[in-house]
Swiss-Prot record:
Gene name tied to this protein: WRKY40
Species for this entry: Arabidopsis thaliana
A Gene Ontology cellular-component term: nucleus
Keyword Transferase: no
Example GO BP: response to molecule of bacterial origin
The name this protein goes by in its record: Probable WRKY transcription factor 40
Amino acid sequence: MDQYSSSLVDTSLDLTIGVTRMRVEEDPPTSALVEELNRVSAENKKLSEMLTLMCDNYNVLRKQLMEYVNKSNITERDQISPPKKRKSPAREDAFSCAVIGGVSESSSTDQDEYLCKKQREETVVKEKVSRVYYKTEASDTTLVVKDGYQWRKYGQKVTRDNPSPRAYFKCACAPSCSVKKKVQRSVEDQSVLVATYEGEHNHPMPSQIDSNNGLNRHISHGGSASTPVAANRRSSLTVPVTTVDMIESKKVTSPTSRIDFPQVQKLLVEQMASSLTKDPNFTAALAAAVTGKLYQQNHTEK
């Protein structure tokens, strides 16, 4: 049987075409890679924390260095310049002075002084604004108000709320007298001039000065008025001064309460004349002056 089987021919068909079998190599295990990745991530995180801590320490050191430098500068400045003398709290806001080597130096800035001065000027102007109404003729188209003072016109313009133009005047004694005046016709009544004054005059009226000078010339020309009489005359001239409040009251809103300046001037003249006639010294001086004048005229005619 064994011999028979060995003598048989192997008739099996080999279907392979000569291609060798390929062995598929398996990948290494991924656990090692995952472990390496975790290690690198942990190292990066640790480095980031160290860098953050280093930045914080740098900022703290830098802040301490700046504080030390500032303190050093302040100490050096205090050693070079002596301490300033502290003034009272009331005047501390206005200015503070430090005396260095006998020379006074003001530590307040020019801007602060300018603002304080401007605020004071505005306060004074607001407190001294007055308005006066003057009655004029219907045919009078000028904006001239005769209030006893001399003015200089420096401008004129038309406003939106009034068809009549507004004229601007300043005192003829400027810049020593800073009073200003605005004149414009009333919207309700075109025959009424509204004069707005800003400030107060620091000098008497020119008309009063002229009248006083005329009386002085009259009495001195007579030659018989003594010094006490002249002193009494001057005192009598200064007594009957009547102050007229020309400031418009806030309660008056209509142009019915107006002040006629010629009537006020007439009242002042009457009061002055009555007070002068009641003074016996002035009467005697006036009589002596008139007598001396008549005597000189008669002597000249002869």
